[in-house]
């Protein structure tokens, strides 16, 4: 009887915890964050970029694959406008250049964001700190990367917000600093434009309550430790996507596009850098998310 009872309790506790997380996200997530049309509470992503492309085809052949799982867990304050948000994730890159052995690089990260609104003001601020373990084999010897961002938002109208800020991270190749500029724009009932450049920018169009399509740009700069130093990826992706809602919250995302100005480099910090000079290729992305939309579908 005991062996039967324990698994039932564990399954029930897991379901209750999941429902609590969803309830907190739906009911209490800060209003200032709702300028973006949705929040992905849990996301699974897989991207495959084969050695086939239309741009820069005369460089070294390369294949890339990517997998990640992540979540967003807000802890709101009493005013329901301010919050601390925990966004832990795991990711892995696989890369193979020409006929060399395939290499894998991993990341375990914990971004923590503090969202603060100012009473009777159109201004708000987001402060972010992120700790990451990036390596070809994560262990006790893996060096921790620490970085963060400051993002100031100005709500010009009910449907339009501008954002400015700066991002800093202690990458394995050195200190990486990047200015930020963003927008959250509800163009009309069917169209949205949102993102923070140079990281990402998304255009979204609603067909009906089950289907949305649009265009995406994202830029990725990360470094991972290895036996001799570091492996660095600079990946820029421009693509088209389709979101299919199976019900109110479960979403399948399909995206296809092309990389632009892709670079894979290795090196030793402040000493040497080697550029693999790889091709830009097509990419195909599949994602499954539990999504909360802040506007009526």
Residue ranges and their predicted role:
Residues 49-55, 91-99, 117, 130-138, ...:
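Sequence/structural signature of outer-membrane beta-barrel proteins
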Residues 180-186, 242, 277-297:
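Outer-membrane beta-barrel "beta-signal"
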Residues 67-73, 108-114, 148-150, 181, ...:
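Membrane-embedded beta-strands of outer-membrane beta-barrel proteins
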Residues 61-67, 102-108, 140-146, 175-179, ...:
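Residues that define the transmembrane beta-barrel architecture of outer-membrane proteins
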Residues 73-75, 116-118, 154, 185, ...:
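Residue-level signature of outer-membrane beta-barrel architecture
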Residues 35-96:
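Short glycine/proline- and aromatic-enriched beta-strand/turn motifs that initiate or cap beta-hairpins
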Residues 77-84, 120-125, 158-164, 190-193, ...:
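Repeated loop/turn-to-beta-strand initiation elements of outer-membrane beta-barrel proteins
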Residues 42-50, 86-92, 127-131, 164-168, ...:
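Transmembrane beta-barrel strands of outer-membrane/channel proteins
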């Amino acid at each position: 009887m005991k062996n039967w009872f324990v698994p039932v309790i564990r399954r029930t506790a897991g379901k209750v915890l999941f429902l609590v997380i969803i309830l907190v996200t739906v009911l209490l997530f800060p209003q200032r964050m709702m300028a973006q049309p949705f929040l992905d509470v849990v996301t699974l992503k897989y991207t495959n970029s084969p050695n086939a492309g239309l741009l820069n085809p005369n460089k070294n052949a390369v294949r890339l694959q990517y997998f990640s799982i992540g979540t967003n867990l807000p802890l709101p304050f009493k005013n329901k406008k301010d919050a601390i948000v925990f966004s832990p994730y795991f990711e892995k890159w696989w890369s193979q250049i020409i006929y060399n052995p395939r290499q894998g690089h991993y990341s375990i990260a914990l971004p923590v964001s503090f969202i603060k609104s100012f009473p009777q003001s159109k201004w708000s601020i987001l402060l972010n700190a992120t700790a990451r373990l990036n390596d070809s084999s994560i262990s006790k010897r893996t060096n921790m990367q620490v970085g963060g961002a400051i993002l100031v938002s100005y709500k010009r109208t009910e449907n339009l917000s501008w954002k400015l800020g700066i991002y800093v991270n202690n990458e394995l190749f050195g200190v990486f600093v990047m200015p930020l500029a963003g927008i959250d724009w509800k163009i009309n009932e069917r169209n949205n434009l949102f993102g923070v450049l140079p990281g990402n920018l998304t255009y979204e169009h609603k067909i009906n309550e089950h289907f949305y399509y649009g265009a995406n740009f994202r830029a990725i700069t990360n470094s991972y430790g290895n036996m001799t130093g570091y492996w660095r990826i600079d990946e820029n992706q421009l693509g088209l996507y389709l979101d299919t809602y199976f019900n109110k919250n479960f979403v399948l995302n399909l995206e296809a596009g092309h990389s632009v100005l892709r670079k894979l480099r290795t090196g030793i910090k402040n000493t040497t850098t080697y550029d693999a000079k790889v091709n830009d290729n097509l990419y195909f992305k599949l994602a499954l998310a539990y999504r909360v939309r802040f506007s009526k579908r």
